[in-house]
Regions:
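Extended, histidine- and acidic-residue-enriched regions that form the cofactor-binding/catalytic faces
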Residues: 1-106, 112-231
Length: 231
């Protein structure tokens, strides 16, 4: 059962008897065929869809649409936060929700660049306030099934690639400019680090996205489909 925090009258919130969910995305380029809010749009749709199917009361906090995205600064439209600012801000957001009576919170991350800051938020809420918080990147939940869904080889499901484009074609097709999608080879990596979203990387690196391609995309969006997104 989905209940949206910002669409509920304060006296009807009943936060004490709900699971709180916070979706955290970004505002950054997703090449020239997906909107700047792609990560946020996908996170919100996925949270709503899951909450509507849940038997428990799910209280959806106002979605956070600005994250850590300096690696996209070479392209137009990015709005980004420093990690320390993001940790401080989201800790306050979450602690406010707990003070309103929320007993537990799930943070759904829909942008890879947010992970370090969000881990900091979870650590701080747990160590300083004793709060129960779980953090998940939504794509990790289907990692064991993705090989039976994807059409591309490793390197095809990077930033604005087959995976994200398929989800956007499913959830918000009116925002996808399919005429601009061109045919590209899979992105390349090595044994230690690969830009595919489902790669099992052994190291972390900071890589500006203009080093991957001229439009900042990574992967093979031309293999995307709304049918794949629905799966």
């Amino acid at each position: 059962m989905l209940i949206q925090w910002d669409r509920t009258i304060a006296w009807d919130l009943d936060a004490e008897h709900a699971l709180g969910v916070l979706s955290v995305g970004s505002t950054e380029q997703h090449s020239n065929y997906l909107p700047l809010g792609t990560d946020s749009i996908l996170g919100q749709h996925l949270v709503r869809e899951a909450a509507e199917k849940a038997k428990a009361r799910v209280l959806m906090l106002p979605s956070q649409c600005i994250g850590f995205s300096p690696h996209h600064r070479a392209f137009p439209g990015v709005i980004t936060l420093r990690n320390d600012v993001m940790i401080e801000y989201l800790t306050e957001v979450c602690e406010s929700a707990f003070r309103a009576g929320l007993p537990r919170l799930l943070i759904v991350n829909s942008h890879g660049g947010n992970q370090t800051a969000l881990q900091g938020v979870v650590n701080r809420l747990g160590s300083e306030f004793g709060r129960q918080v779980v953090l998940v990147r939504y794509w990790d939940l289907i990692a064991d099934k993705i090989d039976g869904i994807r059409r591309s080889q490793p390197g095809g499901m990077g930033h604005a690639g087959e995976f994200e484009t398929s989800l956007m074609l499913h959830f918000a097709p009116e925002l996808v400019d399919t005429e601009r999608i061109d045919v590209r080879p899979p992105a390349k990596g090595d044994a230690w680090h690969h830009p595919d979203m489902f790669a099992k990387n052994r190291v972390y690196r900071y890589i500006p996205f203009d080093t991957y391609s001229d439009l900042g995309n990574v992967g093979q969006a031309h293999l995307a489909s709304k049918e794949e997104g629905a799966r």
